[in-house]
A protein has these predicted regions:
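Glycine-rich NAD(P)-binding loop of the Rossmann-fold in SDR/ketoreductase-type enzymes
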Residues: 62, 99, 103-114, 160, ...
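Active-site segment of SDR-like NAD(P)-dependent oxidoreductases
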Residues: 92-94, 133-140, 194-197
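NAD(P)-dependent short-chain dehydrogenase/reductase
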Residues: 141-146, 171, 175-238
């Protein structure tokens, strides 16, 4: 079955790994990908730029004209494929915007919802929403394993910081996704990522590069709110 993938944030940590996995295993797949290089560079997908299965655009999820161009391209190509899958990897992480609650809203909430509506409008069969383990707040990990997907998330005991607003925004996108699926508009799911670290990260947007960069430039790391008492686990993309 031939599949057309439309991926936002395609040069980022998750997006570029998808490009490698899809194109190395599926000769019939095609990827339309875009990124504004918020926390990445073209180098992460450089080996596929001349591959006719990969169309890359330096576009911004929040730019209406650029997203209309993506939509038009999908509509022009859709009849050549058995299935269309949208994957939303674009996100502004909270590390450098810890105390500025509006900085992550436009991309993470509005942008995600607009991209979801585009997927529905073009008749895509599936939409995969990259959410975050931050929705678990301070309980994302503990000696007993932390919360489970089946547990209730109680916002009453959520910490009061940019991490909370970031997590709340991401949680809202999960409800957008669930609502669209329940109404039969599209098939899809939200994936709650743990703290992921990639060797391809060059910019201190995520927590581990932020720590490394702080040590190199300042010789110290400033621990933000609650960072002295919570524990985190990390997954590394090799």
């Amino acid at each position: 079955m031939s599949v057309l993938f439309v991926i936002s944030g395609v040069t980022g940590m998750t997006g570029n790994e998808l490009v490698h996995q899809i194109l190395s295993k599926d000769d019939d797949a095609r990827i339309i990908g875009f990124d504004n290089f918020y926390a990445s560079s073209i180098e992460t997908v450089e080996e596929y730029l001349d591959d006719n299965r990969f169309d890359f655009f330096e576009y911004d999820l929040n730019n209406e004209k650029e997203m209309d161009a993506i939509k038009s391209l999908v509509l022009d190509m859709k009849d050549d494929f058995d299935e269309i899958v949208y994957i939303n990897c674009a996100a502004v992480v909270h590390t450098e915007h810890f105390y500025n609650v509006y900085e992550t809203y436009q991309t993470n909430v509005v942008g995600m919802n607009d991209f979801l509506n585009q997927a529905i409008d073009v008749g895509a069969q599936k939409y995969i929403n990259c959410s975050t383990s931050e929705v678990y707040s301070m309980n994302s990990w503990n000696e007993h394993g932390g919360v489970k997907e089946s547990d209730y998330i109680t916002m009453a005991n959520a910490e009061h910081s940019q991490r909370t607003s970031y997590a709340t925004g991401k949680l809202l996108t999960e409800f957008f996704m669930k609502d669209a699926v329940n109404k039969g508009k599209i098939k899809g799911c939200s994936i709650r990522f743990a703290n992921v670290y990639s060797k391809d990260e060059k910019y201190p947007k995520h927590i581990i590069p932020h720590i490394i960069n702080s040590f190199k430039n300042d010789g110290e790391v400033t621990l933000l709110e609650n960072s002295k008492k919570n524990r985190r686990t990390f997954l590394q993309c090799l």
